[in-house]
């Protein structure tokens, strides 16, 4: 697989920073981990995924290897080489494992699919210019275009 391009890295960096800043300002307990960071969804030692960004609120899931169990919020940044996996296999895996919120950020179409997995539905599809309400945080709105300025 090809390494992520510059825009992918910029989106990953600015999103992680924005979420981390919000958590710190609000004295939150969740932790933000950009890739590379192993997530063992089935709590075994063999099978893991590396989401572009993982937000974990239950610190008992964290150990030296990464996260054992489902993160609360996962963000994947789609590319031509990962699109099929991000929209198919990973959506199924994250839903089955108990991830609460899943975002697929697509730099090619400049859209963000937000899945509220507790409601088991696609909440909405947004453009980079939209203010996107985060499902797990009532007071957090993210605008990708603003982050990329």
Residue ranges: model-predicted function:
Residues 1-149:
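Gly/Pro/Ser/Thr-rich low-complexity, intrinsically disordered segments predominantly at protein N-termini
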């Amino acid at each position: 697989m090809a390494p992520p391009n510059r825009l992918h890295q910029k989106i990953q960096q600015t999103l992680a920073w924005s979420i981390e800043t919000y958590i710190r300002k609000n004295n939150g307990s969740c932790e933000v981990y950009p890739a590379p960071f192993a997530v063992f969804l089935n709590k075994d030692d063999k099978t893991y995924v590396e989401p572009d960004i993982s937000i974990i609120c239950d610190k008992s899931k964290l150990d030296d290897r990464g996260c054992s169990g489902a993160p609360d919020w996962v963000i994947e940044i789609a590319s031509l080489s990962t699109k099929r996996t991000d929209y198919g296999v990973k959506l199924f895996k994250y839903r089955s494992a108990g991830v609460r919120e899943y975002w697929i950020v697509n730099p090619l179409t400049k859209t963000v699919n937000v899945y509220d997995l507790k409601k088991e539905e696609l909440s909405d599809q947004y453009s980079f210019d939209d203010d996107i309400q985060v499902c797990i945080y009532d007071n957090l709105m993210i605008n990708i275009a603003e982050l990329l300025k």
